[in-house]
Amino acid sequence: MSTQSVQTFGKKKTATAVAHVKAGKGLIKINGSPITLVQPEILRFKVYEPLTLVGLDKFQGIDIRVKVTGGGHVSQVYAIRQAIAKGLVAYHQKYVDEASKNELKKIFASYDKTLLVADSRRMEPKKFGGRGARARFQKSYR
């Protein structure tokens, strides 16, 4: 017996989330704990975004397990939501039909492009002569 499953990943800065999407009964777990335990509440709503965008009917027969490592809390949440969104699209492409995949992609892209495409911005390294990458120490002429 082979189970229908796909594996996708989401990234934000140094945080990486790997999502395993398979046929099931609608469970969503992040690092082994339910999605309802994500703290603080504002970040929990960010994780819920891909789910609320497409409606809960698309999740009835799907289980999602997400493992996330690296980065801070906010980066991890953005990586999780990207992994979930990409996992849904991949699952619908592989096991449902092309039309529903295109519909999901269109919904996600119109709401927020980073749900499907990784944010390529990275931190610029600090240089000498100042406090940060671009900021310089104040200059005095006398």
From Swiss-Prot:
Chief localisation class: cytoplasm
Classification via InterPro entries: Ribosomal_Su5_D2-typ_SF (IPR020568), Ribosomal_uS9 (IPR000754), Ribosomal_uS9_CS (IPR020574), Ribsml_uS5_D2-typ_fold_subgr (IPR014721)
Assigned GO CC terms: cytosolic small ribosomal subunit
Keyword Ribonucleoprotein: yes
GO annotation, biological process: maturation of SSU-rRNA from tricistronic rRNA transcript (SSU-rRNA, 5.8S rRNA, LSU-rRNA); translation
Record's keyword terms, sorted: Cytoplasm, Ribonucleoprotein, Ribosomal protein
Residue pairs linked by disulfide bridges in the UniProt entry: none
Record GO terms (molecular function): RNA binding; structural constituent of ribosome
Family: Belongs to the universal ribosomal protein uS9 family.
Assembly behavior: Component of the small ribosomal subunit. Mature ribosomes consist of a small (40S) and a large (60S) subunit. The 40S subunit contains about 32 different proteins and 1 molecule of RNA (18S). The 60S subunit contains 45 different proteins and 3 molecules of RNA (25S, 5.8S and 5S).
Name of protein: Small ribosomal subunit protein uS9
Organism of origin: Candida albicans (strain SC5314 / ATCC MYA-2876)
Lineage of source species: Eukaryota, Fungi, Dikarya, Ascomycota, Saccharomycotina
